[in-house]
Design a protein with these regions (language model features):
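Charged, compositionally biased interaction regions
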Residues: 17-207
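Internal mixed beta-strand/loop scaffold within catalytic domains of large alpha/beta enzymes
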Residues: 1-14
C-alpha cells in the first residue's frame, strides 16, 4: 500500500532476540495471527515491545540491537547476494527494497547475532513444519503417530510420518502433508516404524 501511495514505510529491524521470536518468525501465520503472540506462547510470557525513537512502529524491547528505518517507495531496486542459503547452497542475486536507516539503538555491550547457515535456520524451522503437518492431520481426522521433518530435506522439503492406518487413509495422509506447507516429498509408514530411523523407513519402503 505504501509503495502504491509513493510513501515511505517505517520499519524496525530487531537483532539478537529470544529464540522463541526467531522460531515464530519462520512460521507462515495466517492473516490475523500475530507471530509475536506465538513467540510469547512459546516463551511463557509476552514479548515486550516499546516505541522506537523515530516513529511509532514498535520494536522488541529486549533485542540486542534495533535498527529503525524506512522502506523507500522505489520498489525492488537494490541487488543483494549471493548468500549461503538454508539448503546448503549459494543463493542467487536478488532484488530487494531500499531501506534507509535513521537510528541504531543497542543494549549495553550488545551481542551481534549473525546466522551461520544452514543449521541455525533449518533446525528451529523444522518445528514449524512439524506443527503445520500435525495441524493438517488433525483437521483431516487422521490418526497421526509421529512426524520427522528430515534434516536431509533441509528440515523443510521432506516429511516422514507414521499413522495408525485405516483403509484408504495412506493417500489422504500424503495429501494432508503436502498441502500443509512447502513439503515436496512425503513418506507414510505404519505406526511400528521409527520415523527418525532411516534404516527402518527404508525397510518399510522396500517391503
Amino acid at each position: 500500500a505504501a509503495l502504491q501511495k509513493d510513501e515511505v514505510l517505517p520499519i524496525t529491524i530487531n537483532l539478537g532476540t529470544h529464540m522463541a521470536v526467531n522460531i515464530a518468525a519462520t512460521y507462515r501465520a495466517p492473516l490475523g495471527l500475530n507471530e509475536l503472540s506465538i513467540a510469547g506462547g512459546m516463551a511463557g510470557e509476552a514479548v515486550r515491545l516499546m516505541t522506537g525513537e523515530t516513529s511509532d512502529v514498535p520494536c522488541i524491547a529486549d533485542a540486542e540491537i534495533v535498527l529503525e528505518g524506512e522502506i523507500l517507495p522505489i520498489g525492488w531496486s537494490k541487488p543483494e547476494g549471493r548468500f549461503g542459503e538454508f539448503t546448503r547452497l549459494m543463493g542467487g542475486l536478488h532484488w530487494n527494497p531500499h531501506v534507509r536507516i535513521k537510528s541504531i539503538s543497542t543494549r549495553k555491550d550488545p551481542m551481534y547475532y549473525a546466522l551461520h547457515m544452514p543449521w541455525e535456520v533449518i533446525l528451529p524451522g523444522a518445528a514449524n513444519r512439524e506443527a503445520a503437518v500435525r495441524r493438517a492431520f488433525m483437521l483431516a481426522n487422521l490418526d497421526l503417530v509421529d512426524v520427522n521433518i528430515t534434516p536431509g530435506g533441509s528440515c523443510y522439503f521432506h516429511a516422514v510420518v507414521s499413522i495408525r492406518k485405516r483403509p484408504g487413509e495412506a493417500k489422504h495422509a500424503i495429501m494432508a502433508a503436502l498441502i500443509s506447507s512447502d513439503i515436496k516429498h512425503v513418506v507414510v509408514v505404519n505406526e511400528d516404524i521409527d520415523v527418525f530411523n532411516g534404516d527402518d523407513v527404508e525397510w518399510a519402503l522396500a517391503t
